[in-house]
Amino acid sequence: MLDTAGKAEAHAPPRARAWRGLDAVIGNRIALAGLVIIAGQIAAAALAPLLLSHAPDAIDYRAMLQGPSEAHLLGTDELGRDILSRLLSGARLSLSVSTMAVTLAVVLGLPLGLVSGYLGGWPDEILMRLLDSLMALPPLVLALTIAAVLGPGLFNAMIAIAIVSVPTFTRLVRGQVLSLKHNDYVTAAYSVGTPTWRVLFRHILPNAMNPVIVQATLGIGFAIITESSLSFIGLGAQPPTSTWGSMVQVGFQYLELAPWYVMAPAAMMFLAVLGFNMLADGLHDALDPLARTG
């Protein structure tokens, strides 16, 4: 009974599934808490120029490494710049770069997974072996290697993160296509003369998107950590650009004198990753019909 209900919901129109999924996310406390954390960080970063009186790059040598005060709520850095302003400025970059990296990985991984899963045979075998070779190294080590080859810079870090993430989405979509391409509604579409490209993008891809959405949400959290790690070792954001990772990298040198310098961006990274993981957990429950009906 439950299995039948789950299958019926899985084959429901995408728009109907989206609305039911949204209702389920709102009703899931963990997912809602994650969404609130993420929305709060995005809102704070977007409104920072309107709410804060200090520019992120404004230097004041008379206020170097000052602790939190009324004038500087989170203190100042080694050049007297307001840490709160730089923290929120860095939030815009860290969140946007991570989101764009995952978006690029999805854009590249979706068609590769579709073609690989649909064609099968030697094209699928060759692609899977190539992806296996990429996944042989730990993701962070592979991202570091690619970023080192491309050179330091935020754009190159984004490309490195995207390349590392592509195999995950390709294999995920491929697995979904393999399980969906022999379903009755796909066979029925072929029987009435529907072109292959339309079957793929109209009947198979929409039904394969739920795990992709969950993985993309998790992937943003991974991208934040990876971008911060690359910036920490000098392969990401370059001065005077501030991201959470670059702030931790510089602040680590003043850990004993100004512990707040490191704690603020580290806390923001922790909250962001926690928020995306909580949201992904809730999305999994919301978008998986078998999980919800069970």
What residue ranges belong to the model's regions?
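Short helix-capping/hinge motifs at transmembrane helix termini and TM-loop junctions
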Residues: 48-56, 117-121, 146-152, 164, ...
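Generic hydrophobic transmembrane alpha-helix motif, especially the helices
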Residues: 73, 77, 107-109, 114-118, ...
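Internal alpha-helical transmembrane segments of multi-pass membrane proteins, especially GPCRs
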Residues: 35, 92, 96-100, 142, ...
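Gly/Trp-centered helix-boundary motif
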Residues: 1-110, 114-115, 121-122, 193, ...
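Glycine-rich helix-loop "coupling/hinge" segments at transmembrane-helix boundaries
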Residues: 135, 146-149, 161, 176-177, ...
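Amphipathic alpha-helical segments that mediate coupling or scaffolding at interfaces
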Residues: 24-25, 64, 86-90, 94, ...
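Amphipathic cytosolic juxtamembrane alpha-helices at the membrane-cytosol interface
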Residues: 19, 81-96, 100, 120-128, ...
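Transmembrane alpha-helix boundary and packing residues in multipass membrane permease domains
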Residues: 41, 114, 143-148, 157, ...
